[in-house]
Amino acid sequence: MRSGVIAQKLGMTRVYNDAGEHVPVTVLRMENCHVVAQRTVEKNGYTAVQLGVGLAKVKNTSKAMRGHFAKAEVEPKAKVAEFRVSPDNLLEVGAEITAEHFVAGQKVDVTGTSIGKGFAGVMKRHNFAGHRASHGNSITHRAHGSTGQRQDPGKVFKGKKMAGHMGQTRVTTQNIEVVSTDSDRGLILVRGAVPGSKGAWIIVRDAVKVSLPENAPKPAALRAGAAKAEAVATEGAE
């Protein structure tokens, strides 16, 4: 199991495939995606890597997090997330993951926070049909109707679809196809829509329901400079 990545949603556009057909894509950008911490079985009881992406102002970073990033020898990050990995896919602290971590045609699972819609009625929130427009109906055209039972059980069951706050929830879309990547600019183009607004932070992982392509880099696609720095550090430790 490989690590996922953190990316920022830039928006949507379209590209053309070899057949001349246009493909709607969402553009995700990886900016300075570094490993800032490790989790090991010996110390933590499980194996994972903590990634940081983007740049944050030092004055807006807490003292504890400044020390955390300094220990990893990376600049303060705007977003941090942890990913479970198998022991053979554990990455060294300070390593930088590039957009080539994913390959064209690969399926990924994308997680983000959906756009908030505010307080919404049942017709918008749950696709209720509503009541009759006329013929004896008044006031209740867009109402949800009865919500309860009888004297027994004498309550409204939890989870009943009603009006309320819509959106602003954590949403995962599975099996989205990676159309292409651009390592130099740190771009990942995925087919279709991705939950979240422009500028939102998105979690991208290998699809859990589809096998990983054989040409996908393992344990990850690392920046050459970062990989070289790791090798030098390893030689120095020896």
From Swiss-Prot:
SUPFAM superfamilies given in the database record: Translation proteins
Modified residues (N5-methylglutamine): 151
Keyword Ribonucleoprotein attached: yes
GO biological process, one term: translation
GO molecular function: rRNA binding; structural constituent of ribosome
InterPro entries attached to this UniProt entry: Ribosomal_uL3 (IPR000597), Ribosomal_uL3_bac/org-type (IPR019927), Ribosomal_uL3_CS (IPR019926), Transl_B-barrel_sf (IPR009000)
Gene3D superfamilies membership: 3.30.160.810, Translation factors (2.40.30.10)
GO cellular component, one term: cytosolic large ribosomal subunit
Source organism superkingdom: Bacteria
Pfam families membership: Ribosomal_L3 (PF00297)
Listed transmembrane segments: none
Entry keywords, A to Z: Methylation, Ribonucleoprotein, Ribosomal protein, RNA-binding, rRNA-binding
Changes after translation: Methylated by PrmB.
Main function: One of the primary rRNA binding proteins, it binds directly near the 3'-end of the 23S rRNA, where it nucleates assembly of the 50S subunit.
Family named by the database record: Belongs to the universal ribosomal protein uL3 family.
Assembly and oligomerization: Part of the 50S ribosomal subunit. Forms a cluster with proteins L14 and L19.
Protein name: Large ribosomal subunit protein uL3
Organism: Brucella anthropi (strain ATCC 49188 / DSM 6882 / CCUG 24695 / JCM 21032 / LMG 3331 / NBRC 15819 / NCTC 12168 / Alc 37)
Source species taxonomy: Bacteria, Pseudomonadati, Pseudomonadota, Alphaproteobacteria, Hyphomicrobiales
Name of encoding gene: rplC
